[in-house]
Design a protein with these regions (language model features):
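Helix N-terminus capping/helix-initiation residues
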Residues: 43, 139-140, 225, 237, ...
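Secondary-structure-rich domain cores
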Residues: 1, 178, 213, 244-245
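Membrane-proximal envelope biogenesis segments
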Residues: 1-170, 174
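Extracytoplasmic/periplasmic, Sec-exported soluble proteins
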Residues: 11, 164-168, 193-201, 240-244, ...
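Active-site signature of cysteine proteases
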Residues: 276-311
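...with weaker cross-activation on analogous glycine-rich loops/strands in unrelated enzymes
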Residues: 215-289
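N-terminal capping segments
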Residues: 148-214
Length: 311
């Protein structure tokens, strides 16, 4: 509950945006040929649980957590950045690549070429709530309070506080939002069954659906290709074109206007978070190789359409 100041949902989104900005500034600060990202962030409920215990039990200045002011916001940001560490390094690699060309007589000629490429590695690591309790020197009572806040019984509370979501129909949105900031997609494509990185936007949607039990229930398919996902929903009459105003939990499919132009086939997918002031807000995997919140105008031309799962 918020009794004054900035709502918690806004502060969380602001910090998520700062985090995305840090990733983008690292990419912009160095010239590279290949980008490899890996790692995962601390989940927001752990960040907020540490913040709640630290705020309410501070022996020098105990405060309630229902309202957010500049001082509390600064503390929350400090805890977030203590729990989440972004590291980066570059490495030059000399590799042999085989190039194919036509000799002009219909014959394919293979030529070995040595190429030196700069790799940019970005890694995200995080501290757990228990590690933060150790770092802050929490007492036994504070640790007990922290553990109680993090029990599964409080998951619906965290969903409401963090994302403003109440009720079971927002379950997949809450799961997707809990993954914002994860990079490289390894948990999602490896869960799907791939041994190495693939374009993982659909794997992410499938993973979120699986966490909610929706794949087993036949509500959302397990799909790694966007075209297959569109076909599954269309066959079941669960499809709307881009003139539709989506609801939270709908699946959005894109047809990017890239160098090859649009072909009426989907090549990217995500989960609808909400619609507000004529814009659709989404959570997307493999957006710049990260899980990110994005937003677009309703009816945006690169949106192919929406799947409407029968939750």
């Amino acid at each position: 509950e918020d009794t004054g100041g900035q709502p918690m949902t806004e502060v969380v989104r602001e910090i998520n945006t700062d985090y995305d900005g840090q990733l983008e500034s690292i990419k912009a600060s160095v010239s590279y040929d290949v980008l490899e990202m890996s790692g995962s962030r601390a989940v927001w409920k752990e960040v907020l649980a540490v913040y709640a215990v630290k705020t309410t039990t501070d022996p020098d200045d105990p405060q309630e957590v229902a309202s957010m002011d500049d001082g509390k916001k600064a503390l929350l940001k400090e805890i977030f950045w203590t729990m989440n560490i972004i590291g980066s390094r570059t490495e030059s690699k000399t590799e042999t690549v085989i190039e194919e060309s036509d000799d002009g007589h219909g014959n394919i000629v293979e030529t070995e070429t040595t190429v030196t490429q700069t790799y940019l590695y970005i890694t995200v690591t995080h501290k757990t709530a228990d590690e933060m309790a150790e770092q802050y020197g929490f007492s036994a009572d504070q640790r007990k309070q922290l553990a109680e806040l993090l029990t599964d019984e409080n998951n619906s509370l965290w969903t409401a506080v963090l994302y403003g979501i109440t009720g079971s129909d927002g379950q997949i949105v809450a799961v997707a939002l809990s993954q914002v900031g994860n990079v490289g997609g390894q948990p999602y494509w490896s869960w799907y069954g791939f041994n190495s990185r693939v374009e993982w936007c659909a794997c992410f949607v499938s993973w979120c659906a699986n966490e909610c039990g929706y794949i087993e229930a036949g509500i959302i398919p397990k799909y790694a290709g966007c075209v297959n996902g569109v076909a599954w929903f269309k066959e079941r009459g669960l499809w709307q074109d881009n003139a539709y105003e989506p609801r939270p939990g709908d699946i959005i499919f894109f047809d990017w206007d890239d160098e090859n132009g649009q072909d009426g086939l989907s090549n990217h997918t995500g989960i609808v978070e909400k619609v507000e002031n004529g814009r659709v807000y989404t959570i997307e995997g493999n957006s710049g190789d990260s899980v990110r919140q994005r937003d677009y105008p309703l009816g945006y031309y690169e949106v192919l359409g929406f799947a409407t799962p029968a939750y």
